[in-house]
Curated annotation (Swiss-Prot):
UniProt subcellular location: Cytoplasm
Species whose genome carries this gene: Escherichia coli (strain K12)
Region feature (Required for stable 30S ribosomal association in vitro): 109-133
Entry protein name: 30S ribosome-binding factor
Example GO BP: ribosome biogenesis
Name of the gene encoding the protein in the UniProt record: rbfA
């Protein structure tokens, strides 16, 4: 029977917390002037590689997002060394940062659903207007 919540998931969960603290307290890069949130971490089975998914507070500006991801990639060695001090791991994983747009997409989908529901209710209240379309 396979473990539902194995070691890679537990390490990823703890690593997410530690990276969030490191980004909040230790990283002083001006390109990361916007608030950075670690939305998830995926670990390889051998714990040698980690995909770190981040979101930014000001994610409307695509250039700022690209600059933020680039800054995180350049600081990944420093983050990795701090992570090695904070967590007891035999191998500190190689970090790769990705922008997580699921929050933005979720907001967009929610707005679409809200507008469709609003439009539907307007048509229900004024059925004469819909016949003219």
């Amino acid at each position: 029977m396979a473990k539902e919540f194995g070691r890679p998931q537990r390490v990823a969960q703890e690593m997410q917390k530690e990276i969030a603290l490191i980004l909040q307290r230790e990283i002083k890069d001006p390109r990361l002037g916007m608030m950075t949130t670690v939305s998830g971490v995926e670990m390889s089975r051998d714990l040698a590689y980690a995909k770190v998914y981040v979101t930014f507070l000001n994610d409307k500006d695509e250039d700022a997002v690209k600059a933020g991801i680039k800054a995180l990639q350049e600081a990944s060695g420093f983050i990795r060394s701090l992570l090695g001090k904070a967590m007891r791991l035999r191998i500190v994983p190689e970090l790769t940062f990705f922008y997580d747009n699921s929050l933005v997409e979720g907001m967009r989908m929610s707005n679409l659903v809200t507008s469709v529901v609003k439009h539907d209710e307007e048509r229900r209240v004024n059925p004469d207007d819909s016949k003219e379309d």
